[in-house]
Amino acid sequence: MGFGSENLDTKRFTDEMLDWVRGRGKILIVIHDNPDPDCLASAIALRHLFVMKVNREATIAFSGMISRSENLAMAKELEIPLTPIGFINFREFSVVCMLDTQPGTGNNSLPADRSVDILVDHHPMRETSKKCRWVDIREDYGVTATILYEYLVTQGVYLGTKLATALFYAIKSETQDLGREANKPDRDAYLKLFTLSNKKLLYEITHPKLPVEYFLMVNRALENTKIYGKLLITNLAQMNFPEMVAEMADFFLRLEGIELVLAMGQYGDGMLLSLRTIRHDLNAGILIGVLVEGRGNAGGHGMMAGGKIENVPASPEAIHEAEDFLANRLLTELNIIDIKPQTLQGLREKRNFDEPKREV
């Protein structure tokens, strides 16, 4: 029931969904692997809704790891109850919810033989998602947490300070302070939640201490950067923290003259990818699908996307082969030919040479 914001009455949808949940057993909330602030905030918001409206607590399950220091601080400071999915006995749960991801996308660890009952997301609709009983996918929203915030408001549920802080930080980080893919519902929620959030907790989340490995990976990304005009490609090689690819993609998009960034890094048994752009004529979700076709899975939307190609072991040769494969596909798709890649140092020297000499 329900397939998008343009046809969805939120009050009716949540009323009927809660009535359906009320007559069933234990509830499981599944979020995507290596969770980010959006899915974390969405999960505790839905959990709070169930507590307040049907008097039932849900279990939040995730896979992978939370390695980005800001996300770790968020989970700790806001006391988000999380259970590794490996400890979950799926037979115990009568209701399965999925947030900020969809069945079959490859970025969540729900077993393929387990169906999803309640699905809430803001990414493009997958055909398999239409089989779920309760579906609310709003591609015109920048953040899944905004949808969950609207559920709470529509149902008249009180938001405590920690929940408000979680939802605010999710919108803040996902949209980069409303500057990336934020629409009116996201802006409205952001402004209302700001007044309810705990500013000291926000400071603790946004200014955590960073491990030395973080700086070593940043240094590796800087050294392995290749620039093709307005395109930048960086390879973090073998990574300690899977979330670094997304962080480095955002980081390098701030470089003057750069409009598109592909960041990659080897983790586990594959190569993780993150794509970021400021170009409105490109769709990052479609573009990254081209990159991984036949070798992995990916998902995303207008300005940001992520993915993984499988079977890339942690050897220099395999990592280099994967980089060449992805770079060649991207350059071909963008019709970038006969452009010799530059390093950051080479770019600096070229720009210094091209700049007109100032008279003293």
Question: Where do the protein language model's features map onto the residues?
Answer:
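An acidic intrinsically disordered interaction segment
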Residues: 1-18, 105-117, 139-144, 148
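Hydrophobic helix-and-loop "lid/oligomerization" segment in the mid-to-C-terminal part
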Residues: 2-37, 41-72, 77, 92-93, ...
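Hydrophobic "anchor" residues on beta-strands that sit immediately upstream
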Residues: 28, 32, 96, 117, ...
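Solvent-exposed alpha-helices and their adjacent loops that cap or buttress functional pockets
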Residues: 20-21, 88-91, 109-112, 127-129, ...
